[in-house]
Amino acid sequence: MPREKGRKVVASNRKARHDYSILDTYEAGMALTGTEVKSLRAGRASLVDAFAQERNGELYLHGMHIPEYVQGTWTNHEPRRTRKLLLNRIEIDRLIGKTRESGLTIVPLQVYFSDGWAKVEIGVAKGKKSYDKRQDLAKRDAQREIARAAGRRGKGMAD
């Protein structure tokens, strides 16, 4: 069977972009079992409350939920197990160095298949304060109103 091409998004962490300001992003592979891959291909995953953490010089993804594969038997995986992230040593060292700074953490942003391989997009993030979140919402609403008004003007409708 030929390998699929392109990028197929399985799950995205929209809350991460709301709660954190993303400073830098990386693409990492994941060490998965067979039933985890089958469950991901079925589009079943959740990144809510997931984060990456350093242990013994490696990065691990905690809290990501991949439900058990429906047709799986005794070989099924544990849904919230810790999964190893596959990165180059230079990238791992750079990420570990950044997380040692105060207030920075690593959060997963998306899980997707890239040319048949399961990947996770991780971001180095700094937590937002509540007033930052309110400002972002106000900016987004203002942009939406501007776009709506421009659309009406383009269609010849009066405000």
UniProtKB/Swiss-Prot annotation:
Family, similarity comment: Belongs to the SmpB family.
Name the domain of life: Bacteria
Q: Which UniProt keywords apply?
A: Cytoplasm, RNA-binding
Q: Name one GO biological process term.
A: trans-translation
One Pfam short name: SmpB
Keyword flag Cytoplasm: yes
Name the HAMAP family for this protein.
SmpB
Gene3D superfamilies according to UniProt: 2.40.280.10
Q: Which residues form a coiled coil?
A: none
For this entry, the protein name equals SsrA-binding protein
Instruction: Please indicate if the UniProt record lists Kinase as a keyword.
Output: no
Q: Which GO terms describe its molecular function?
A: RNA binding
| Protein function | Required for rescue of stalled ribosomes mediated by trans-translation. Binds to transfer-messenger RNA (tmRNA), required for stable association of tmRNA with ribosomes. tmRNA and SmpB together mimic tRNA shape, replacing the anticodon stem-loop with SmpB. tmRNA is encoded by the ssrA gene; the 2 termini fold to resemble tRNA(Ala) and it encodes a 'tag peptide', a short internal open reading frame. During trans-translation Ala-aminoacylated tmRNA acts like a tRNA, entering the A-site of stalled ribosomes, displacing the stalled mRNA.
Which InterPro entries does the protein's record reference?
Answer: SmpB, SsrA-bd_prot, SsrA-bd_prot_CS
